[in-house]
């Protein structure tokens, strides 16, 4: 059995809870579009999201009462002091989700953000290779809601945390709490871009998934984007030579255009991509 583990942000940490719910529902829809049904989706949250469609019992909400940071009364975004607690909240939820995956004796586990979309082919591919130590998504997609195209995203595992799959023998050590804590640290705390090397040091070979398996969505609620706003939003922009700036802009534009792919019906079907979400 394949288990997806998703940490869901509290409504108290969002400026737009209905949007968080809509984005998560699209993520869950992509999970439930798998071509094989041997999977579970464990979602750790403070409060279950409000959904417009019904899912069967393979979707499980694990409600936890982890401490929450406060919000500044003068700004819609979180106060600076909240960021460490917000990060800890996500880690705590991932650890709780991994523990639930162990209790369910999952053969493979994958951490999946609450707004990313997974290919309908992923579970079938992973379960057809029970001998594998695990997998990582080296190539994926990037999508910004409101657009009619996606962008190819190579080096996906360095951008999104929805990228690593681990076999049970490397995260489920019944009765050995310290080994399980070590596995959690390598999968969560080490950083998603460093997980391949971190597990290689333990003798674990994570293979690259041989197709673009996940869509990283940019939607204004990504933790990485919010953190960037917090760190760099008020930083003054240095002016550079106008010709050099223009050349750089042209180069970036050409590179971006070369990566674009139309959101075909096949891609929309594979990832349950809903272009109607603003």
Spell out what each predicted region is:
Residues 1-6, 30-31, 39-43:
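Hydrophobic targeting segments
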Residues 11-22, 82-86, 178-188:
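Short, flexible/disordered intra-domain loops and linkers
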Residues 21-38:
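Short, acidic, metal-binding catalytic loop of nucleotide-sugar glycosyltransferases
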Residues 45-47:
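Acidic ATP/Mg2+-coordinating residue in the GHKL
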Residues 49-106:
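Active-site-proximal specificity loops/subdomain of glycosyltransferases
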Residues 119-188:
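Conserved catalytic core of nucleotide-sugar-dependent glycosyltransferases
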